[in-house]
Structure formats: C-alpha cells, structure tokens
C-alpha cells in the first residue's frame, strides 16, 4: 500500500508553524483532557451517521464512553479541522481507547467484533491499576 507523504516540518515557515500550533489549541486541550480522564472517548459531530453508528455499536457492546461533539456539517468546522490536524485522522468519529487512536466507525466496529477493543481497555486498565500510575501501554 502506498502511503501519503507528510510535509516535512523543515518546509514550514516559522510564522506558519506557529499558526498551526495555536489553531484552536483550546479544543485540542479539551480532547486531550478527555482522553486522559476516560477509558474510551468518541470525538464526533452532530448529524454524522458514522458517529451515530459507532456510538450505537459501543452502547450495544456495553462499552462506556465519553462523547465530545463539535458542531455539525454547518458549524464549528474549524474546531474539527484542528482535531484532525492534531490526530492525523481525516474523518469523524475518532475513537480513542486508553489514549490510543483506534480509528473511525469501520475500525471501531471491527475492534468490537473481534474483542480487541475490550481487550485493549482491560489489559491497559489492569496495568494501570496494578502499578497505580497513569502510564499508557499498548
């Protein structure tokens, strides 16, 4: 599979790099805080059927999750763009398990079906509770 190239940071002017780093930083901080505080986090938007489907699949699987919504197709697109730039994931939903991005609807449903979502959450949860630290292991 061919991979998409990523622009080398050396090819971004300092002023542009600063603009990228400060673009809706408060939104990214909110997502980072939720990921640190909750085992499973779904980042999405209103009216998006893929977000709705992944939330339904998690509910049906009995997986508790924190949901963060940023606008709809008609609002808050810049906030969603900041999240996409931060995570590198191009679409919504974005699902995180114990701090690890597992993907969107398709990959989340596959992880539910094959048990890897629950396994990841439980394996890491036990490692964290046994050590008493918040270190993330994959």
Q: What is the predicted role of each segment?
A:
Residues 74-81:
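Structural motif
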Residues 83-91:
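Thiol/disulfide oxidoreductase modules built on the thioredoxin-like
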Residues 68-74:
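Short beta->alpha junction loops
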Residues 97-132:
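Non-catalytic, surface beta->alpha helical segment in thiol-disulfide oxidoreductase systems
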Residues 24-68:
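Local sequence-structure signature of Cys/Sec-based thiol-disulfide redox active-site neighborhoods
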Residues 1-36, 132-138:
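N-terminal leader/targeting and pre-domain segments
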Residues 42, 93-96:
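Cytosolic beta-strand hydrophobic patch enriched in CBS
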